[in-house]
Amino acid sequence: MTANFFTDNADLAYHLDRLDLEEAVTILENGFHNHKQYPGAPRSYADAKDSYRLILSTLGEIAANQIAPLAAEADEVGVQFEDGKVTYAEVTQQGLEQLRQAELMGALLPWEYGGLNLPGTMLQMMIEIVSRADPGLMSIFGLQEISAIIAEHGDQEMKERILPRFAEGTITGAMVLTEPDAGSDLGGVQTRAIYDEETDTWRLRGVKRFITNGNADILLVLARSEDGSNCLLYTSDAADD
């Protein structure tokens, strides 16, 4: 029998069966009218629950049979830093590719951007499944959460340029918060965001440290500006291609 990190987890199955997400899912799915424009959208709450179960089971099978067997090698090889660039271990990249091919990288994103339009509870279950297989890969997979922040607060140009690529899994993200003298106390952040009127550009000055997946393509950087603390979106050269 094929191993599955969802179906063999009684705790996750119990919560999926008993969580009452009907109100939240009804709002997410626009009263279950989204299917008229997006064929993959559920037509009812029962349909949504069936879809969630299938997604979790698919991920559970990938995690157990394709990701977990390579986790030890991922730890042993680790990330590589050469010529100023950080790269994941080859087996970590293989794990990400499996998740991309299964179309599991846009969990929280709306249908219009190619996402799965899942409630946050479902993503947390997905993160638990990946964590069981490979905690390092879980950090990369879980940080797709920042795409939901962009979907909620970004402008339209930003959304159209970035979110479909998150859903495709071709870019990754990170939250850039911690500094040498500001960890859990984010009010102590000293990095500054300075606006350059001549070039119409925001420039960041400061030091960040201990950033999970800090080599990501899309970074949300917490910095001080004249209006207080704000998150600025930084894109790598790869993300701008």
Residue ranges and their predicted role:
Residues 2-5, 45, 49-53, 81-86, ...:
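Hydrophobic alpha-helical scaffolding
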Residues 60-61, 90-160, 164, 168-169, ...:
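Internal helix-loop-helix
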Residues 1-82, 86:
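Extended, charge-enriched "interface" segments that sit outside catalytic cores
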Residues 234-239:
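Conserved small/polar residues in nucleotide/adenosyl-binding loops
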Residues 116, 157-226:
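Glycine-rich, Trp-frequent "lid" loop and neighboring beta-strands that shape
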Residues 12, 16, 55-63, 67, ...:
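Long, contiguous hydrophobic alpha-helical segments, chiefly transmembrane helices and signal peptides
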Residues 27-32, 70-80, 109-111, 139-143, ...:
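Short coil/turn segments at secondary-structure boundaries
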Residues 231:
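Glycine-rich phosphate-binding loops of NTPases
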